[in-house]
Amino acid sequence: MVGSAEPVVCQFYRLIPGAPEPRRADRSADGTLPVNAYRYCEAIASASSFGWYLYPPLSFSLWWDGTEIAWTYEGADEWYPLRGAQYPNFRETFQKVAPDGLGALAPPFLVQGMLPGVVQIWSGYLARTAPRWALLSRGAVNIPKTQGYENFEGIVETDTWFGPLFTNVRLTRTNSPVEFHMRRPLFQVQPLLRQCYQEPSFKVSEVADIKEDDWQRFADTIKPNTDQMRVLGHYAVDTRKRLRGGL
């Protein structure tokens, strides 16, 4: 949530009732980072906390035999072949709230991809970003991958494209259930300015091109690490002070 004076970069719209709310990603990678990394490695902690976690709208499982995919969900009595699957009873729910003429456009919850073992999973949300902002969709940052799937990464220009916020996953395990739980982040979205990914310019220079003030900055970075009695996490402390000062 933000105060009224702070502009909203991303707005999420919940379509599936009861779907878990997106949550700001946290510095501990949802509690999975080692304590030393969380306390002293600002680079890892900052990357972990960049963006928001999205969760499955219900707990479910996928089963891939190498050719066909089946799915089931909490409370179901059997496995169902997967082609395209709606969230239970969502079609009727959507028809009640959609404007006239749009009732047949309920987004599917699961869709089998064109590639073997690939499934598209919808979070239950739509998303819209401020002008010139997009969303990078990816796996949850620095959370160990132990669930038998990998997230594809993609950038969606959500300032103009207003549609379902989903992730594509590649199943990496066959002949055993791959489980997705409402309490575990399914994927992470990170806001990006368009100028950051539309082929920004770069330049390659040689060591002779390094200026004197750059050498001083290099020394300021490296010298503290040569002191065996140095205080751990000095970079983290300096970075946090600078951010608190708005620099």
Name every feature range the model reports, one short phrase each.
Residues 1-161, 172-247:
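Non-catalytic terminal segments and appended small domains
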Residues 164:
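Active-site cofactor/co-catalyst pockets and adjacent glycine-rich loops in catalytic enzymes
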